[in-house]
Amino acid sequence: MEDKEKELKDGFYPQCYKIHLDISTVNVNNLIEELSRISNMIFDGLIPVVYLRWGYFKKDLTDLLSKKITNEFFCEEVKLESCVGQSDLVSVFFKENYENAFAEYINQEKQKELLKIEENIRRANERLNERIKEAKASQNN
């Protein structure tokens, strides 16, 4: 855990926000989906870093950049040294340098989509060629 805390402190700029979500109100398996449904409060130019009490992961999400404040959900600006996980809360930290990292993430997602489309086109062409061969073969017989 010390490495993660050090990595967190070293990697963060003074502008750091912490969003708390009471995990008793959320199915933890659907945490990202739950967070991504929350909207209306925008943190511009920031990368979300999500800390769970039992672990750590980082996820770039467009929807996570918009937040709706509710009784169970609140946001606060925090000092650099307090950017660490909380015991019964999910803490979402945002750090600067969102723009490039998120653009890269979007490009990767677009690349994946393009590869899927290209693969679908290739398969469709193969099926079409097979049908043409079958049609020609049946005409010749």
Show the residue positions of the predicted features:
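Short, low-order "capping/linker" segments at domain edges
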Residues: 62-64, 85-109
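Periodic self-assembly scaffolds
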Residues: 108-135
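Short, intrinsically disordered low-complexity segments
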Residues: 40-86
